[in-house]
Design a protein with these regions (language model features):
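Predominantly a Rossmann-like dinucleotide-binding segment in NAD(P)-dependent oxidoreductases
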Residues: 123-208
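C-terminal helix-rich "cap/oligomerization" subdomain common to oxidoreductases
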Residues: 66-69, 222, 298-331
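N-terminal Rossmann-like dinucleotide-binding module
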Residues: 1-47
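Hydrophobic residues in well-ordered beta-strands that form the structural core
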Residues: 13, 53, 92-93, 117-119, ...
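Active-site loop of classical SDR/Rossmann-like NAD(P)-dependent oxidoreductases
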Residues: 35, 283-297, 311
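Beta-strand-loop-alpha-helix segment that lines the small-molecule cofactor/substrate pocket
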Residues: 66, 72-73, 77-124, 139
Length: 331
């Protein structure tokens, strides 16, 4: 039985708390911390889990095996470095931090202590994603021809009116680092990191915000495969993110929680679950917690078996670097 603590009790905590309650035969929540007394009280009343009012209480308790860091991105480096110094494994909400330089320092702090760092990029855990990864990695679909990602979401102005939302200082970026990171992470898992990126990046009249809410990018891989990235939070009312793969022996579409593979021999294969992952529209938390539970289960397995999680710090750095390249190309 592992003992864990939660740091950060804002919007992101709900799927994690539900996941931990589901996994109560494997893990026990020792503490839940927020500097806000109101958030601590609301969390304790809703989930019936113990709370504390000092981060030091968690770090000094040697019985705590791991910490879930669910705080704003610009706080991640400091908190994770303190967790590493205290010998705690960490499950970290995306992104790693607000810049790749800070993200690299964060990952090093955990690796240098031989601690497990798992990053919450839960779309990797979808059965549909895993099936497509398998088909491409095994060569069953043949050589990759094209790979594209479409992130067509809606966020009202009220979303960006929240303090720090969409700013470089707190979030590190806009649609790519906050929303598109999930789909781009899956794209890399399927196709690898592209060799060349050319892009356009802008902020539309739909939003008043510091960072980008619309990106169009062209990608080229060493294999000569091509692709595009289209990401926005201006697409009312929002549609599920999707990835389209063209390969030698078939074409695949991954949308929401379902993948459809159309083989050249006439077969059609479906993988995953019917429905949608949710979160495409104004209600950003309108999604099931199944894949967060899968992240937690994989994290616990990684600790117990002394192996890397599915999305380690090193894996998460790949998508950070791709986002940097897209933004730099777009000026």
């Amino acid at each position: 039985m592992k003992r864990v603590a939660i740091v950060g009790l804002g919007m992101a905590v709900t799927p994690h708390a539900k996941s931990l309650l589901d996994l109560k035969d494997r893990v026990r929540v020792a503490y839940a911390y927020s500097p806000s007394a109101a958030r601590r009280s609301q969390f304790a009343q809703r989930f019936g889990l113990p709370e504390c009012d000092r981060l030091e209480t968690i770090l000094e308790d040697r019985s705590v095996d791991a910490v879930a860091v669910l705080t704003p991105p610009n706080t991640h480096l400091e908190i994770v470095e303190r967790c590493a110094a205290a010998g705690k494994h960490v499950l970290l909400e995306k992104p790693l931090d607000v810049s790749t330089a800070r993200a690299e320092k964060l990952v090093h702090s955990m690796n240098s202590k031989h601690l497990v760092l798992a990053v919450v990029l839960q779309n990797r855990h979808k059965p549909a994603t895993k099936r497509l990864v398998q088909l491409l990695a095994s060569g069953e679909l043949g050589r990759l021809v094209a790979a594209s990602a479409y992130v067509e979401l809606w966020r009202p102005q009220s979303y960006y009116d929240q303090p720090g939302r969409g700013t470089k200082a707190r979030d590190g970026g806009g649609v790519l680092l906050t929303q598109g990171i999930h789909t781009l992470d899956v794209l890399i898992a399927l196709a690898g990191e592209p060799a060349e990126v050319k892009s356009f990046v802008t902020t539309t009249p739909v939003h008043r915000m510091e960072t980008e809410d619309l990106v169009c990018a062209a990608l080229r891989w060493d294999s000569r495969a091509l692709g595009v990235v289209y990401a926005t939070t201006s697409n009312y009312p929002g549609t599920p993110e999707r990835i389209e793969i063209v390969a030698e022996r078939g074409t695949a579409t991954l949308a929401g929680t379902l993948a459809e593979i159309r083989w050249h021999d006439g077969r059609t294969e479906r993988a995953g679950e019917e429905g949608t992952a949710g979160g495409a529209g104004a209600d950003t938390m309108a999604f099931p917690h199944d894949y967060h539970r899968a992240v937690w289960s994989d994290f616990l397995d990684a600790i117990e078996r002394k192996r890397a999680p599915l999305v380690s710090g090193a894996e998460a750095l790949k998508v950070h670097r791709l986002i940097d390249r897209i933004l730099q190309s777009g000026g």
